[in-house]
Regions:
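Bacterial N-terminal signal peptides
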Residues: 18-29
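Bacterial N-terminal signal peptides that target proteins for export
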Residues: 2-19
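Carbohydrate-active catalytic/glycan-binding domains of CAZyme proteins
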Residues: 32-538
Length: 538
């Protein structure tokens, strides 16, 4: 629950009048709606965006979460909704089931999204095995169902490209390219080549390929990490008259934004209005990698990003006429018999260990494997957290927990802040703790979890409880605070403010709201989640 400053009646009435006036002007066409950056103040990294008709479609990275590779849709760059996923689960490795390791921070990365002659295409390479496959998936509707069209060798951060003559290419790595067979089932022999050589100032990573053709020229957009003093990121573009080169390079964006380091990695897209736009992400602390939206101006044949000063603007005109307000994170009363698209599981779920139908109106989470910590638990379910401030609470029915069970709500990441209900014999206690997971570099196997218990409260024979976590992602904060409520009482703070962090060495994503339930002694218990109530300060 978010709290805002109270104001007197006169100020409230003035504010209501102003809002009504703006609404009327907007409906009459006198005022253009705006998009405030970050366009999406949540973890939505590695975007690829295309336009098909009146809609913009976007795919992003969700790594170890299932279902994976969310497909989002918008008419205006402001109101985005998740309409589907490329896959429900990945099964190439037992690590997706948390066997022989995990895929924390790996899994699905940097997907390329395309539309060609009535078919949507998506290409991605799971990053859990660098010698593994690249998937090409197809669908007639971006919402799905998607099916595997072919599997190729590994292409890192690749872009799929259909040329005007219907020849198909994959541009990947650091300026590498190959042609695919016309059926997209393999690589044309002898077609592999490098289309440019890294320059001396490119001292760090050069990746995140996005390839387009405009006015007869070929353009490759990439992120450039420069490890020189100052360590900065920028968006660069390589341009050529022939797809195989020679290519020339230009820096098209080098800008920080909102008190955070430089913006880099994303794509450009042509708008419904004939203009071009850039969608580029930015590392923004504990909330993760957020999306910024900016003009793309063609100057001397180069796609120059940012405003007239080359910077990410604070606001942008809304790029369309969407009349609905849509969201990427929302409340859920679990009244449907199918799980909402807002939710993602941590790794592949155990389907028989959860239900929306055994007790209608509740999400039932059953214990399964016996584990010692939340990072090893199966069937943890999550949604993103959002800036600038957000709040989420869950209502839990605890009556069917058994000795040793642990359930609760987390600000979940490699560093997590937890509200945990512990069943100990016949009693219950509420624990606010902070955890840090340790993972092996190669297999991402869990080698240990550090836990700092900040505060615990004896709940005696509690049957039902509400848990709440507030997130503050305003610059310089990244703070989670914790509360609980029993019955019709007031919200009671517990523990201490927790500093949320983004750590690429661990989960490599933004902090998420996560609901968990696991057994430490014996399987067979379960909790019923009555509701998930979410709010965000716009």
């Amino acid at each position: 629950m978010l709290k805002f400053k109270k104001t007197d009646t006169m100020h409230v009435n003035i504010r209501r009048f102003c809002l009504a006036l703006v609404a009327c002007l907007c409906m009459s066409g006198s005022v253009s709606a705006i998009v405030r950056n970050p366009m999406i103040w949540a973890d939505v990294p590695d975007p690829d965006v295309i336009r098909v008709g009146e809609y913009y479609y976007m795919v992003t990275t969700t790594m170890h979460l299932m279902p994976g590779a969310p497909i989002m849709r918008s008419k205006d760059f402001s109101n985005w909704e998740t309409i589907g996923y490329l896959f429900d689960r990945l099964t190439d490795s037992p690590k997706y089931d948390m066997e022989d390791g995990t895929v924390y921070g790996r899994g699905q990365w940097a997907t390329s999204l395309r539309y060609h002659k009535g078919t949507f295409y998506a290409l991605f390479a799971p990053n859990d095995n660098l010698g593994g496959d690249t998937y090409i998936m197809t669908a007639k509707d971006a919402a799905g169902p998607w099916k595997i069209h072919s599997r190729l060798r590994h292409f890192h951060d690749a872009s799929l490209f259909f040329d005007d003559d219907d020849r198909v290419y994959v541009i990947y790595g650091t300026g590498e390219m190959c042609e695919l067979t016309s059926d997209l089932q393999g690589v044309v022999p002898g077609s592999e080549c490098r289309i440019f050589q890294r320059e001396a100032d490119e001292t760090g990573l050069l990746e995140g390929s996005r390839f387009i053709k405009h006015d007869g020229k070929y353009y490759l957009l990439m992120i450039s990490h420069v490890w020189a003093p100052g360590r900065y990121r920028r968006q660069v573009c390589y341009r050529a008259d022939d797809i195989k080169g020679p290519y020339e390079k230009k820096v098209i964006l080098q800008s920080d934004f909102g008190g955070f380091p430089h913006v880099g990695q994303g794509t450009i897209v042509d708008g419904n209005d004939g203009k071009w736009y850039g969608v580029i992400f930015q590392d923004r602390g504990g909330v993760g990698r957020v999306l910024t939206y900016m003009p793309c101006r063609w100057i001397d044949g180069w796609p120059i990003l940012g405003d007239e000063q080359g910077r990410v603007p604070d606001t942008m005109p809304q790029g369309g006429d969407e009349v609905r307000s849509t969201h990427l994170v929302t409340s859920d009363d679990f009244s449907n018999d199918k799980l909402s698209l807002y939710w993602q599981w941590n790794h592949n779920p155990i389907d028989e260990a959860w239900s929306l139908t055994e007790r209608p109106g509740f999400l039932r989470l059953k214990t399964n494997k016996i584990v010692s910590n939340v990072y090893a638990a199966r069937n943890t379910i999550s949604q993103r957290m959002e800036g600038p401030r957000c709040s989420a609470s869950v209502t839990l029915d605890l009556r069917h927990m058994v000795d040793g069970d642990r359930c609760g709500l987390a600000a979940f990441n490699g560093h997590s802040g937890l509200l945990t209900i512990v069943r100990d014999g016949k009693s219950y206690k509420l624990v606010q703790s902070n955890t840090l997971v340790h993972l092996t570099d190669r297999e991402k196997a869990i080698t240990g979890v550090d836990e700092d218990v900040v505060e615990q409260v004896d709940l005696k024979r509690c049957k039902k409880i509400q848990l709440r976590i507030d997130g503050d992602f305003t610059p310089g904060k990244d703070i989670a605070t914790f509360y609980y409520k029993i019955g019709k009482g007031e919200w009671t703070p517990i523990g201490e403010p927790f500093k949320m962090q983004f750590d690429y060495r661990r989960l490599f994503m933004g902090t998420r709201y996560a609901i968990f339930n696991y057994a430490t002694k014996q399987a067979g218990g379960y909790v019923d989640v009555d509701s998930f109530d979410y709010s965000r300060e716009e």
